[in-house]
């Protein structure tokens, strides 16, 4: 897998939340041999024993069950250890979610069928927004408590914690809460990780303006997950094939940022190469 990434011309790769324990020996061999470098890991990596598919939300910092939060901490710390072993700079985190209806799927279906101007759509969108605000407090409190436990461990290891924006409406932090979050956690080891596809989906749904969002968080921005979105929510598409305006994002992209192409494994090599070329042509050498 890593050799295939290298053969596509990449010097660095991110180890994802789909890495099984059995894959580690080969990964470490490739890294130790200098065949590829690791920029970042996505929690949880490696997967817990017995879990064989990508499971970034297997355990959540927001879970009301203490045992589940303990497991989230345990496997996050294990991710930290692997990150140090492969000399990665950052670990990307999902912080958790609140219990509520699946508005994301309902709104997506309605958006595809009726569009944003539908009165029914706007009514459901407003209901979802109000429900989130009413339900978030306890989940956010648990997230903060858990982060206060793991942050010193990240600082001790010299790791950045990349707090990723999410596409599901129930996930934390909410779009308007990121600035409050970063005031609460002002450590330089806590940074913002912008998933371009997730931001685009939230724009389609009417919950986010990605450019304004990035403007407000530019000082904490450290990395990107790069992919496009086929309207309304077909993410992990090759850049240049969907609705993302990569040119509008260019001013936020800096040489020191970690940039990870997060593309569907079903894409043919040619589509990947075209997508990478689209971003490089648009962003230049940043």
Which ranges hold each PLM region?
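A short beta-strand-loop structural module common to alpha/beta enzyme folds
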Residues: 11-20
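Histidine-acidic metal/acid-base catalytic patches
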Residues: 1-6, 21, 26, 32-34, ...
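Short beta-strand and adjacent tight-turn residues that come in two discontinuous sequence segments
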Residues: 15, 41, 93
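Short glycine-enriched loops at secondary-structure junctions
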Residues: 42-49, 96-98
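Residue-level detector of anion-binding/catalytic polar loops
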Residues: 11-12, 37, 89, 160, ...
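Short acidic, glycine/proline-enriched helix-loop-strand junctions
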Residues: 23-41, 108-121
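Active-site acidic/histidine proton-transfer and metal-coordination neighborhood
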Residues: 60-192
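Alpha/beta catalytic barrel-like cores
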Residues: 1-4, 18, 55-63
């Amino acid at each position: 897998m890593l050799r295939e990434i290298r053969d596509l011309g990449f010097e660095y790769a991110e180890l994802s939340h789909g890495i099984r324990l059995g894959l580690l020996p080969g990964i470490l061999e490739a890294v130790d041999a200098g065949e590829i470098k690791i920029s970042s890991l996505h929690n949880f990596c490696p997967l817990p024993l017995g879990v064989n598919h990508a499971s970034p939300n297997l355990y959540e910092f927001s879970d009301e069950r203490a045992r589940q939060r303990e497991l989230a901490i345990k496997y996050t710390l294990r991710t930290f250890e692997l990150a140090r072993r492969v000399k990665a700079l950052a670990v990307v985190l999902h912080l958790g979610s609140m219990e509520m209806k699946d508005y994301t799927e309902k709104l997506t279906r309605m958006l595809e069928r009726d569009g944003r101007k539908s009165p029914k759509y706007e009514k459901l969108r407003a209901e979802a927004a109000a429900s989130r605000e009413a339900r978030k407090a306890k989940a956010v409190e648990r997230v903060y408590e858990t982060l206060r436990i793991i942050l010193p461990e990240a600082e001790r290891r010299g790791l950045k914690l990349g707090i990723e924006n999410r596409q599901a409406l129930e996930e934390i932090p909410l779009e308007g809460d990121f600035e409050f979050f970063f005031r609460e956690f002002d450590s330089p080891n806590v940074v913002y990780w912008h998933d371009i596809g997730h931001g685009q989906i939230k724009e389609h749904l009417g919950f986010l303006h990605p450019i304004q969002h990035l403007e407000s968080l530019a000082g904490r921005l450290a990395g990107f997950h790069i992919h496009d979105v086929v309207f309304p929510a077909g993410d992990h598409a090759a850049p240049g094939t969907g609705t993302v305006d990569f040119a509008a994002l260019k001013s936020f992209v800096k040489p020191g940022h970690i940039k990870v192409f997060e593309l569907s494994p079903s894409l043919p090599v040619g589509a990947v190469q075209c997508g990478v070329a689209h971003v490089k042509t648009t962003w230049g050498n940043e």
